[in-house]
Amino acid sequence: DRRVMISAAGALTLFGLGHAAYMIVSGLPGWGAFLAIWAIQGMLYSSILTPAGRLLRKSAHAEDRPSVFAAQFALSHACWLVAYPVAGWVGSAFGMGTAMACLGVLALVGLLIALAVWPAEDPAEIGHIHRDLAPNHPHLKDHPVRNNQHRHTFVIDDEHRVWPTQG
């Protein structure tokens, strides 16, 4: 999922910035070119959003999924709440090419954040230590400790409040 989503985000960002440069230099594209651009951007956007449901499902226990999906819905709409007014205000004040460039920069920021916080190596099971749990805690009984740590599919929950790190 990461490879598809990051690749599509990178392509969409570059395509958007290229489209902005074209519009600043040459103006709005013709109707046929506009439809082709719209279709390409839609395919790239769908390549980012379509795997998101699977990613969210893998990131939470079944009982937490409604909250995770609600949080993703709220966050995506908060981002749109920023992007739509920026597009409208910048587009009316400085032109559509400049608006497209601003949105391309916003997409680039999102891509850089994703690259920084989503590790390229993201194994399903992660070995980790629970210093705060008693040796007879049910979680440690479900996933026995071996070599001073235990492994299982890792999600943020009551027993795992932070993502394990290597240092």
Regions found by a protein language model. Give the residues of each.
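C-terminal transmembrane bundle of multi-pass solute transporters/carriers
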Residues: 1-121, 125
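Intrinsic disorder in cytosolic terminal tails and internal cytosolic loops
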Residues: 117-167
